Amino acid sequence: MFRGASAINLDAKGRIAIPKRYRERLHVDFNSQLVITVDFDAACLLIYPLEAWKAIEAKLLLLSDTQGPERAMKRLLLGYAHECELDSNGRLLLPPPLRQYANLDKHAMLVGQLNKFELWDEAAWQQQIELSRETIQSDAFANSERLADFSL
């Protein structure tokens, strides 16, 4: 499981170094095989171990090619999906279209989301955190049935 937020940098070639605390697990459990794609709801990237991504592809395969919203989701997630492997230094090369989608330049945040990572531009991440705080304090959050009994 991946958790925590790490400030990282992109190098001049568009590579990121995955923090050391995740590298061994990615290598041993997932053979360093990853898939990077875009988030359809935010300007960030999603990084999945290949095995987890295969389960998502199976769900996408069930979606229609003739229904607009389903086709749009398939087009976005699969069209940007890029299979890659960690290099010997624990780095991933982010293709230019993915960097552009998430407005990634130099400073980024790698955020563990249990089964995947999100990769954000650092400034966009700070804005997202503020929006998340506002959402948590809103009536919509308080009225959510799924969160009614959630406590820490």
UniProtKB/Swiss-Prot annotation:
Transmembrane segments: none annotated. GO terms for biological process: negative regulation of DNA-templated transcription initiation. GO terms for molecular function: DNA-binding transcription factor activity; transcription cis-regulatory region binding. It comes from the Bacteria. Signal peptide: none annotated. InterPro entries: MraZ (IPR003444), MraZ_C (IPR035644), MraZ_dom (IPR020603), MraZ_N (IPR035642), MraZ_sf (IPR038619), SpoVT-AbrB_dom (IPR007159), SpoVT-AbrB_sf (IPR037914). Keywords: Cytoplasm, DNA-binding, Repeat, Transcription, Transcription regulation. Its main location: cytoplasm. CDD domains: MraZ_C (cd16321), MraZ_N (cd16320). Residues 5-52, 81-124 form the SpoVT-AbrB domain. The keyword Secreted does not apply. PROSITE patterns: SPOVT_ABRB. The keyword Kinase does not apply. It is found in: Cytoplasm, Nucleoid. It holds the Pfam family MraZ. GO terms for cellular component: cytoplasm; nucleoid. Coiled coil: none annotated. HAMAP family: MraZ (MF_01008). Forms oligomers. Belongs to the MraZ family. PANTHER family: TRANSCRIPTIONAL REGULATOR MRAZ. This is Transcriptional regulator MraZ. It comes from Shewanella loihica (strain ATCC BAA-1088 / PV-4). The lineage of its organism: Bacteria, Pseudomonadati, Pseudomonadota, Gammaproteobacteria, Alteromonadales. The gene is mraZ.
